[in-house]
Amino acid sequence: MKATTLALTALTLTSSACASTYTVRQEVSPTVTEIPVVKYDPTWKCPNCSPEEQYVLAELQEHTKISDRNALATIMGNIKQESKFIPNICEGGARVSYDNCYSGGYGLIQWTSIGRYNNLGKFCTKYGCDPSSLEGQTRYMINESTFQRYLPMFEGSGQTVRQYMVPAFYWLGWGIKGNREIYSYDYVKKIVWS
């Protein structure tokens, strides 16, 4: 009897183990969020430059076809010689608004002739910018007819800073060369492609 009970118990346990129900799990695929691919276009940057220098460098590349480091460095070196990137500077060093500079040059490139000086004001009146600001002067500088006349000489490539100084001279008409070429070569070292 013991053997029959033991066999019956073993059979019952085996049957109940086989009779267990199994649940089938369905795999749920995770929600896929598509990330748009943004094309990165490298440009010349100057990480160790002032915010004003960085702004002008970016705007020159954004609104012209200048891609040569030496050309950009030459323009930057000339601006540094003229104004140290201080937009509201009157020749001699006074920091004044556009309307309060009564003699000499004014602004980023020291607009000196009455025509060029007045055209800065007219441009900013027409396009809603401040002629005393970095942004307004940079816009005017890039669009000014004198700069536009010599722009193709900067948009070429492969010249030295010294060679780019020729169109820079005609663009600015400086009286004193000063350190503009030294500043330009300094920018050549500081400007990086990234």
For the regions a language model picked out, list residue spans one by one.
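Short amphipathic alpha-helical segments that mediate assembly, nucleic-acid/protein binding
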Residues: 4-5, 53, 69, 147, ...
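N-terminal export signals and maturation junctions of secreted/periplasmic proteins
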Residues: 3, 8, 15-63
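Structural helix-adjacent loops and short alpha-helical linkers that scaffold large soluble proteins
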Residues: 65-67
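Residues that form generic nucleotide/phosphate-binding pockets
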Residues: 59, 144, 191
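Active-site or metal-binding loop neighborhoods of secreted/extracellular toxin and effector enzymes
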Residues: 156-194
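Short, functionally critical alpha-helical segments immediately adjacent to catalytic or ligand/cofactor-binding
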Residues: 69-86
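Peptidoglycan-targeting cell-wall enzymes and recognition modules
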Residues: 32-56, 81-157
